[in-house]
Swiss-Prot record:
One of its GO terms (biological process) is ribosome disassembly. One of its GO terms (molecular function) is translation elongation factor activity. The keyword Ribonucleoprotein does not apply. Residues 8-290 form the tr-type G domain. This is Elongation factor G. It holds the Pfam family GTP_EFTU. The gene is fusA. The modification N6-acetyllysine is found at residues 504, 643. It is found in: Cytoplasm. Keywords: Acetylation, Cytoplasm, Elongation factor, GTP-binding, Nucleotide-binding, Protein biosynthesis. Catalyzes the GTP-dependent ribosomal translocation step during translation elongation. During this step, the ribosome changes from the pre-translocational (PRE) to the post-translocational (POST) state as the newly formed A-site-bound peptidyl-tRNA and P-site-bound deacylated tRNA move to the P and E sites, respectively. Catalyzes the coordinated movement of the two tRNA molecules, the mRNA and conformational changes in the ribosome. GTP binds at residues 17-24, 88-92, 142-145.
Length: 704
């Protein structure tokens, strides 16, 4: 099969927003105008197409980023058909992992803001993630029909709160119930959408007389921004020459692709105004797969040689699995983004991260949760594969004859855990199966069995994250569970280097004995300096311990790291240097050296000033001014460190760093302090040493 859409006419975009900015309605309208979806789904009555899990429809928040394909030829049919692949991203802080995951595979993004609420704390988190992956973006200021809507105020917040350089492409004509359309600042015309056909058709009209002066001022601002793209254009502009529409658009596109400016559009998705022009801006200004740098990877040659893949059908096949979803009809769906080459259903590919081969059984393209089966996918495509056996989020799929590992995704460690048990014994096996599937879908969610209590423990990024997991078990797998009290994921580490710690395991009473003897140094590592949080250096000279036993020493220590001597929590940021020891020709074995290493580890750990680390959360509270004192007082009682506050239109925004252990039940307390008028967001920031009284209480509670 030949390629149907040239790759330069692809746009792989994400639509990202704070909860309640109207992102779901915006996506729905995109599907409507691109002709995929003929009845507009409203999130107000739970019928939206993109939000395909029951839960999302009930809570009105988007949890899983579904990928949808749509085609657009422009409001005035001015382009050849462009293929837009939309990755829907969640807006709640407990799901930032989903956002991060989708940012990896996007080429561009549309940031949706509410014209009333403006830039919210969650918008800042998403913004940082987009910066991290250098994603070019444009903004859409939605809900211009709401009370208190103010387009230019939001433009200013994009500048002050996000540190970006916003350039309006449009101005709103009227606001609140008087919002009727937009001024196109490139064409210098008003756009008036036809209410009778839900905004499918439109007219260009003259700019309203009372807006001409303002429009000229912002048109000038737009032209200046365009002129800064090159010296040539700047000279032309300064020489008093008019820039053509092509020159303006080309220059603005260049600056968006370089992440120098954010073009801002506006509208009301609910009132069918503005989404159409925003789609034109996606085509005009956001990158195709060939406009972004080639993806980097490493060759599977044992030397980690850097390599790259360009967005071309002629290069070897390479793709990144960015999401695993469980589908009620077909089982596992693996969403993947193709960076290079072509793959057909029935082909065998290599999962280079796991060094395993996988066969592409069926390939489907998703439209929200409806699917269309396709035979092949090419560079730039986003699709889902059915029937892959052992693929996890972040794995690379590639041509077995040209193996490459694309940049790995990094996922944060969970910070909160709870014990779960099925309400009936009969559900035990079903629960294990359900949790296993959910953990495969979501790398920021973990599940394990506590060896001492034999309880099943689930861990995630926040209380809401775990609530939703428990809820999904009930809905999708029909397993009802009782949930324990949330537990904090503490860590242990050392603060001091200790040298020449000896560990000896010797049993030589008749018959074959056991003998292993090691001497190690232990030392603290800079937090975050080693992604594993542990390093092992083999410094054995002259074969005092034979090479075949060295991995056993490393393994013996790694097993001890899982449950530290202090309170049984994982040990992090620690290095081991093995530099001496002895062995016995007959009695030495791997097991003996493993045991010797664990004896040395326990001995050394006690002497190395062990400390307990606790997760610290970055907390932002928005509260009415009159409650500021109460909120700050309450955060201080929770051992919070105040990091600053600023005045907002809606009240005061307080920034603090608070230990997670003190944040349980905070939502309820904040509601009662402020009569429900305050809101807060919380995300993991870092691990820090717990004060001795807190550490003591934790250690005693663990019975150590």
């Amino acid at each position: 099969m030949a390629r149907t859409t040239p790759i330069a006419r692809y746009r792989n975009i994400g639509i990202s927003a704070h909860i309640d900015a109207g992102k779901t309605t915006t996506t729905e309208r995109i599907l409507f105008y691109t002709g995929v979806n003929h009845k507009i789904g409203e999130v107000h009555d739970g019928a939206a197409t993109m939000d395909w899990m029951e839960q999302e429809q009930e809570r009105g928040i988007t949890i899983t980023s579904a990928a949808t394909t749509a085609f657009w030829s422009g409001m005035a049919k001015q382009y050849e058909p462009h293929r837009i692949n939309i990755i829907d991203t969640p807006g709640h802080v407990d799901f930032t992992i989903e956002v991060e995951r989708s940012m990896r595979v996007l080429d561009g993004a549309v940031m949706v803001y509410c014209a009333v609420g403006g830039v919210q704390p969650q918008s800042e988190t998403v913004w940082r993630q987009a910066n991290k992956y250098k994603v070019p973006r444009i903004a859409f200021v939605n809900k211009m029909d709401r009370m208190g809507a103010n387009f230019l105020k939001v433009v200013n917040q994009i500048k002050t709160r996000l540190g970006a350089n916003p350039v309006p492409l449009q101005l709103a004509i009227g606001a609140e119930e008087h919002f009727t359309g937009v001024v196109d600042l490139v064409k210098m015309k008003a756009i008036n959408w036809n209410d009778a056909d839900q905004g499918v058709t439109f007219e260009y009209e003259d700019i309203p007389a009372d807006m001409v002066e303002l429009a000229n001022e912002w048109h000038q601002n737009l032209i200046e921004s365009a002129a800064e793209a090159s010296e040539e254009l700047m000279e032309k502009y300064l020489g008093g020459e008019e820039l053509t529409e092509e020159e303006i658009k080309g220059a603005l596109r260049q600056r968006v692709l370089n992440n120098e400016i954010i073009l801002v559009t506006c509208g009301s998705a609910f009132k069918n105004k503005g989404v159409q022009a925003m789609l034109d801006a996606v085509i005009d200004y956001l990158p195709s797969p060939v406009d972004v740098p080639a993806i980097n990877g490493i060759l599977d040659d044992g030397k980690d040689t850097p390599a790259e893949r360009h967005a071309s059908d002629d290069e070897p096949f390479s793709a990144l699995a960015f999401k695993i979803a469980t589908d009620p009809f077909v089982g596992n769906l693996t969403f993947f983004r193709v960076y290079s080459g072509v793959v057909n259903s029935g082909d065998t590919v290599l999962n280079s991260v796991k060094a395993a081969r996988e066969r592409f059984g069926r390939i489907v393209q998703m439209h929200a949760n409806k699917r269309e089966e396709i035979k092949e996918v090419r560079a730039g495509d986003i699709a889902a594969a059915i029937g892959l056996k052992d693929v996890t989020t972040g794995d690379t799929l590639c041509d077995p004859d040209a193996p490459i590992i694309l940049e790995r995704m990094e996922f944060p460690e969970p910070v909160i855990s709870i014990a779960v048990e099925p309400k009936t014994k009969a559900d035990q096996e079903k629960m294990g199966l359900a949790l296993g599937r959910l953990a495969k879908e979501d790398p920021s969610f973990r599940v394990w069995t506590d060896e001492e209590s034999n309880q099943t423990i689930i861990a995630g990024m926040g209380e809401l994250h775990l609530d939703i997991i428990v809820d999904r078990m009930k809905r999708e797998f029909n397993v009802e569970a009782n949930v324990g009290k949330p537990q904090v994921a503490y860590r242990e580490t050392i603060r001091q280097k200790v040298t020449d710690v000896e560990g000896k395991h010797a049993k030589q009473s008749g018959g074959r004995g056991q003998y292993g003897h090691v001497v190690i140094d232990m030392y603290p590592l800079e937090p975050g300096s080693n992604p594993k949080g542990y390093e092992f250096i083999n410094d054995i000279k002259g074969g005092v311990i034979p090479g075949e036993y060295i991995p056993a020493v490393d393994k013996g220590i790694q097993e001890q790291l899982k449950a530290g001597p202090l309170a049984g929590y994982p040990v992090v940021d620690m290095g081991i240097r093995l530099h001496f020891g002895s062995y016995h020709d007959v009695d030495s074995s791997e097991l003996a050296f493993k045991l010797a290493a664990s004896i040395a580890f326990k001995e050394g750990f006690k002497k190395a000033k062990p400390v307990l680390l606790e997760p610290i959360m970055k907390v932002e509270v928005e509260t009415p001014e009159e409650n500021t004192g109460d909120v700050i007082g309450d955060l201080s009682r929770r051992r919070g460190m105040l990091k600053g506050q600023e005045s907002e239109v809606t009240g005061v925004k307080i920034h603090a760093e608070v230990p997670l252990s003190e944040m349980f039940g905070y939502a309820t307390q904040l509601r009662s302090l402020t009569k429900g008028r305050a809101s807060y967001t919380m995300e993991f920031l870092k691990y820090d040493e717990a004060p001795s009284n807190v550490a003591q209480a934790v250690i005693e509670a663990r019975g150590k």
